[in-house]
Amino acid sequence: GTRGLSRAADYLSKQFTLSGVPPLQANGGYFRDYPLVQYQWANSTIASDKNLFNMMTDFYGYAGANNSFSYTANDIVFLGYGIDDTLYSDYKNVDVKGKIVLIASGEPMVNGKSVITGSDSLSAWSKDWRKKAAAATSNGVMCLLTIDPKLAEILNNPQWKNFLEGSLIKRQSEYKQPEYTNNLFISQNMADKLL
């Protein structure tokens, strides 16, 4: 734990002793080990030949949905919307295995109708980032970059900012590797500079 947590535990232990509460553990103490894993991204950056992009300014990602990573890539593949559906696939005849892939959010529309649903209702490909992340994972993508048109709005929202900058703590026994390839959400400006 942190220094503050240790001090709080010491204080509680002393208060229990002063109050006459008998120790609960076989070792004569009041506390048991409770191993935790903390996910937190701090000062994350992405560098290109001419630019340095910063977490919470140019991009964001979900700490629990990504592994710690460091990549070097000669190029980034732009792959439309990153959809891999029987009705529409950006992955068809494209080798993206081991590559960094950049995609647009949303889905293709023709005359105000989704190519996938055939109506003005959007498909699951537009509603849940995990669907595109799963497609990227199954196609061997090394890292998925999604252009988020709402990035500035999200990063200027105090609740979102606190959530994205904060840490995620889980019991060590519940820890599991993220099920998707690493994925980040980037600004249009960052996308323009990367391509």
Where are these regions (language model features)?
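Structured catalytic/translocation cores of nucleotide/phosphate-coupled proteins
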Residues: 1, 128, 175-179
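Noncatalytic luminal/extracellular "stalk/propeptide" segments of secretory-pathway proteins
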Residues: 1-113
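Hydrophobic alpha-helical scaffolding
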Residues: 2, 122, 180-184
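Extracytoplasmic/secreted proteins, especially bacterial periplasmic and envelope-associated proteins
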Residues: 3-18, 29, 128-135, 140, ...
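BRCT (BRCA1 C-terminal) domain core and associated BRCT-interaction motifs
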Residues: 34-43, 152-162, 187
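Short secondary-structure transition/capping segments
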Residues: 49, 66-75, 148-155, 190-195
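A conserved hydrophobic secondary-structure block that centers on an alpha-helix together
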Residues: 75-160
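Long, well-ordered, tryptophan-enriched scaffold segments
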Residues: 138, 142-152, 163, 169-195
